[in-house]
Amino acid sequence: MPARPIPVPAFALALALAAALAVPAPAAAARVKELADVVGVRENALYGYGLVVGLAGTGDSERVLFTQQSVAGMLGRLGIRIDPKDVRARNVAAVMVTARLPPFARPGTRIDVAVASMGNARSLAGGLLLVTPLAGGDGKVYAVGQGPVQVAGYDAGAGGAELRKNTPTSGRVAGGAAVERAVDFALGQAPLVLALRRPDLTTASRLAAAVNAKLGAGTARAVDPAAVELSPPPARKDDVVGFLAEIELLEVEADQRARVVVSERTGTVVAGEGVRLRPVAVAHGGLQVRVQRDPAVSQPAPFGAGRTVEATRDRAAATEAGGGVVALPATASVQDLARALDLLGASPRDLVAVLEAIRAAGALDAELEVLE
């Protein structure tokens, strides 16, 4: 008789990945450009209001007053006078246009723009974005967008039936905006500071040490866990770009806090390296979980060259009312705890509840992040 497939709980698959992540391994070094950014060198958000035309009857209805007013205003600038109340075009949609202005973008550079309907248009497919000024937070126009809108979904219907895929009321215009104004930033005139993407005292200290070892003492100073201040040597004052490029290529061993991420909805459990449990006992409904530490002694053979060493042996076990006991290896990790609950058929909700209780008791040496 063929073997019957064994059902796998929702979070069983995630345990393999979590266990692999928890295996101690030498920390990999990363380049500085993956760990930090130069303060002031960043993208800037742009936005604008525009019209998309050429829609096949899927635009805004006459109930969207601002679309009627926008169409009338546009025609008025072209010398055509019309009352907004008389606008009855369903092939026009009012949209909000957004873009990201890259650092050091020069006039003439093309950037992508995103468009999203503001009214009751059903789809922007096949539409054309008219000339739209894109301003920054200071109100100045930095780019102008225009072009055909690409939509990743569709909306079709007839006779009361409707078929929709993805979100056809938003889309993109590839290279649809031309930069008209550059953001003023004089690299080298302002103090040079590297901002860590994941603030950490150890990482900041290691980064400063790596820079000083490469370019000389006093070149870098860790100001706080998130910032490293740079002081170019006198010979590099006029070569700030080369100075920063050399620093970006340095490799630094980044450090981070131990963290456990769980999702109650999917049952996913991800634990990083260094996550451990302290001795604790937890009772949750019919489940009982115990993690304990026993003293042990490593005794060498008689007349051997070794010496007696004291050690500890960590054990964890989980039981269910009316069920058996699942013993774990001589370790006390989140992966072993999750695997024990998995063997007992516990639900993802049970796993999340147990981990939260262990954290509240101070027995989880890591941050616990619960995803929605």
From Swiss-Prot:
One of its GO terms (cellular component) is bacterial-type flagellum basal body, distal rod, P ring. GO terms for molecular function: structural molecule activity. Residues 1-29 form the signal peptide. It is found in: Periplasm; Bacterial flagellum basal body. Pfam families: FlgI. Transmembrane segments: none annotated. Its main location: periplasm. GO terms for biological process: bacterial-type flagellum-dependent cell motility. Keywords: Bacterial flagellum, Periplasm, Signal. InterPro entries: Flag_FlgI. The basal body constitutes a major portion of the flagellar organelle and consists of four rings (L,P,S, and M) mounted on a central rod. NCBIfam families: PRK05303.1. Belongs to the FlgI family. Assembles around the rod to form the L-ring and probably protects the motor/basal body from shearing forces during rotation. This is Flagellar P-ring protein. It comes from Anaeromyxobacter dehalogenans (strain 2CP-1 / ATCC BAA-258). The gene is flgI.
